[in-house]
């Protein structure tokens, strides 16, 4: 519990004059303005990246992802995998303490993974861990995890921000309320959570990495209004803000006290086409639509330059991603292909969007105008979350009204399986997952399944390349852009940046 002692009481104790004789060091307190509120401080029960990002203040995993989305050791020192791909033996870092004084060890790992893989706990991230058969303690610094079936991307699952190590003592003490009482091994510990206003964390004196953290506190403050978030940087009320609205970026860039940063992301924006429905069952129609979109112009019109044209169906930062020559803008070629497909005068269709914010509206309007130039009349609908859940995610192929669908995907494991399987595997048509193209190819299914059964990087590369080659050629999507992430911070704040999955990195953050 934080104790506050007033200046009056210090004076009464005869201490005020001696304290005043020494200049006080300025506290290194940072305020971060973010775009939405937090749902929980339990990473296993959070579906939103922001809640998991804030939870990194308190929590760490066995592994993590660096700024290039490559796996790195955190609380683990290394691992081995059995020849059959079923057993992972992980060596743990010694001498690490939780913020409540409990030891971090193999028993703590078992407690967390047993909880995460138990369907009776109804945790939102259960699907990440449902392949775990059992977790065993070999010795205090070694844990053995056995899977139900081989899954070669498993270490990426352990590197996912959801896979945090929570103090077993805290789990026992707080139970289902652990989301309000985070206790981890991270650099900061919870000071205050005002659920309508902010989360404040303070330096954890017992942190295992010497010399860290350098900040005294971080206050995470949700500010949903774009203009207010930007204004807080201008006035010094905040030292870091994300996301920065595109229309505010130029203004903030002119402020000599601020630095505007556009960083790479793994957020791919695309339009899927329902290949089970006419006219999108015709490959020439799908090719025509890809030629019809001027992606360079789209980057300027809808994203103010803060995006790059897509060069594949998997963003370049993701492991095993393949890049291709981007589709050129060629409306004449598009009209020729439509004619060959039997649609010389074009056709009418619908274009839905998974979001209704201003950027999505701009993409819809731009695409509608581009399609009109080749004779396609698209009726556009920007959906809210409820509509999307009911009309897109909740309906199977026979009852689905999806034809063209603008959306996005971020593979936060950093590995190709989560970028491909939910979106292209035959078994993942809605309502199972998010294959809104209702795409199906036996070779792609076979390649994706085989890639999870091998730990040979060369074989995985071959399989993922073959799958992506087929998907790119068959064009169930109109790949549009990969977004850039726009943030801004005070120039005296260093080591604080945005990860490609829109999480935050602040391990080495300092206020000069």
From Swiss-Prot:
Stretch forming the signal peptide: 1-26
Keywords, alphabetical: Periplasm, Signal, Transport
Matching InterPro entries: Peptide/Ni-bd, SBP_5, SBP_5_CS, SBP_5_dom
Transmembrane intervals: none
Subcellular location(s) per record: Periplasm
Principal subcellular localization: periplasm
PROSITE patterns in UniProt: SBP_BACTERIAL_5
Classification via Gene3D superfamilies: Dipeptide-binding Protein, Domain 1, Dipeptide-binding Protein, Domain 3, Periplasmic binding protein-like II
GO cellular component terms, semicolon-separated: ATP-binding cassette (ABC) transporter complex; outer membrane-bounded periplasmic space
Gene Ontology MF terms: peptide transmembrane transporter activity
Pfam families reported in the protein's UniProt record: SBP_bac_5 (PF00496)
Gene Ontology annotations of biological process type: dipeptide transport
Subunit structure comment from the entry: The complex is composed of two ATP-binding proteins (GsiA), two transmembrane proteins (GsiC and GsiD) and a solute-binding protein (GsiB).
PANTHER family named in the record: GLUTATHIONE-BINDING PROTEIN GSIB, PERIPLASMIC BINDING COMPONENT OF ABC TRANSPORTER
Protein family according to the UniProt entry: Belongs to the bacterial solute-binding protein 5 family.
Role this protein plays: Part of the ABC transporter complex GsiABCD involved in glutathione import. Binds glutathione.
Protein name: Glutathione-binding protein GsiB
Natural source organism: Salmonella choleraesuis (strain SC-B67)
Gene (UniProt): gsiB
